[in-house]
Structures are given as C-alpha cells and as structure tokens.
C-alpha cells in the first residue's frame, strides 16, 4: 500500500474543554518531507491540536491522523515529540538518561551519539552532571537530543527555541534543519517569525480556534499585501496579544 502524500491530516477538528470550544472545525495537512509551522498567539489552540494529534487529548469531533491512521504508542519509534513542558529524570546523569532513551529508541551506539551531540551543543562538560543541576535551557538542549536521536520520520516540536539567545537559537535551528535534510517531516510551533521565514515551507495561523491563514509562506504574505510575517502576526492578533 502506498503512503499518503500527507503525513499529518487534521479534518473537521473540534475541541472543547469544560463547555468552552477552543478549536472550531480546523482542517489542515502536513505534506511528507516539509517543515510546517503551526502559528498563533498564546491560547489559540496550537498545543491542544498537537496533543490531540498524539492521542493525549480526545477530540470532541473530527479526525486527526498520522500516516493515514490514528496515533498509537508504537508510532513513538517513528515520531519524535518535544513538548513545551520539559520532563526529564532530574536525579539521573545527563549521559545516562540520553543513553537509556537511545537504547529504547534503537540507536545503535547511543552513548557515542549522545557525547557527539553534547559536544555540538556545548554541553559535553555536563555529561556526568545530574539533570537537575542544568539550567532550563541546557535541559531543553538535552531533551531535543533525545527527541531526534533515532532519526524520527516525523518530528513535532512545541516551541523548541523558546527562551534561547540568538546564538543558541541559530544552533538549534541548524540542528533541526539537519534532521529535516535527513528526510524528516517537521511540524513546529514557534513565536519566532524569523524561524518560520528560514525553515518553514508552509504554515497555518490559528485565531479563535480557526484557521486565519494557511498555505506557503509566500501565499500567506501575498494575502496580507506582502508585509512581513512579524507585521502579519501583529495585524492578526493585535499588539497586546503579540
């Protein structure tokens, strides 16, 4: 059976919490091999959409599919997910945690891979430190490494560079782009429009639980008379929300 052109499909998706509807009839697809931006102000439904896609939330209505079917725990070996909330074994050493997850994910040389990655992100001197001794940004780098270490076919990232300075943001964007160059499809949430400009092929802007704009970056700009993505964000969500 041939694989569908879209690795992610969201159809007629509706999500309600406590009687309040936060997602209203949302439809979009992520094409195989692209980098797709899921954009919106705080509370627009981005994270809820990802969690429903991964089976962490039950949609009120609609269908959310990965590779043409609902997500199951077994799909975790081909889907890498970096959540907004970072959760690691805080009392364990960095290298031990990375090696453990590498073994779970089928990485052939997990310890060697982990050390090479830690060198890349300037954390090799922290390899034998306990996770709890690391800053939040350092923990975020470690968790990104765990997420990508088995070359997932689909990489889902919820604000992967949040809180980083420009140098480290660029470093992480370079790493994410390298994963993409190896063949991964990437679905990412970000509030940094320069990342969207640099990385994303297409994007969707959510507002009030619905799609405000959807398409290639060029098409979205054209819809707003070719202003910048930052200007579009302010125009759509208002200066107070942005």
Give the positions of each predicted feature.
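A short, surface-exposed alpha-helical micro-motif characterized by mixed small hydrophobic
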Residues: 196-198
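Conserved ABC transporter NBD signature motif
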Residues: 62-77
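Catalytic Walker B motif of ABC-type/P-loop ATPase nucleotide-binding domains
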Residues: 155-159
């Amino acid at each position: 059976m041939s694989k569908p052109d879209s690795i992610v499909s969201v159809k007629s998706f509706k999500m309600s919490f406590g009687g309040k509807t936060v997602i209203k009839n949302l439809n979009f697809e992520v094409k195989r091999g692209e980098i797709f931006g899921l954009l919106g102000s705080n509370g627009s439904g981005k994270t809820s959409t990802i969690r429903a896609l991964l089976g962490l939330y039950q949609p009120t209505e609609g269908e959310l599919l990965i590779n043409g079917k609902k997500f199951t725990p077994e799909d975790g070996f081909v889907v890498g997910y970096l959540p907004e909330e970072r959760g690691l074994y805080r009392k364990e050493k960095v290298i031990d945690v990375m090696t453990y997850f590498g073994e779970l994910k089928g990485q052939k040389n997990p310890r060697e891979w982990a050390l090479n990655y830690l060198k890349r992100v300037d954390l090799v001197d922290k390899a034998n430190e306990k996770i709890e001794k690391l800053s939040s940004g350092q923990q975020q780098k470690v968790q990104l490494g765990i997420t990508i270490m088995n070359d997932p076919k689909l990489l889902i990232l919820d604000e992967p560079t949040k809180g980083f300075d420009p140098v480290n943001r660029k470093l992480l964007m370079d790493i994410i782009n390298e994963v993409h160059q190896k063949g991964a499809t990437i679905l990412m949430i970000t509030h940094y429009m320069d990342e969207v400009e640099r990385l994303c092929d297409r994007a969707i802007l959510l507002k009030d639980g619905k799609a405000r704009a959807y398409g290639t970056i060029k098409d979205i700009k054209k819809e707003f008379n070719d202003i910048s993505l930052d200007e579009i964000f302010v125009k759509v969500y208002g200066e107070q929300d942005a």
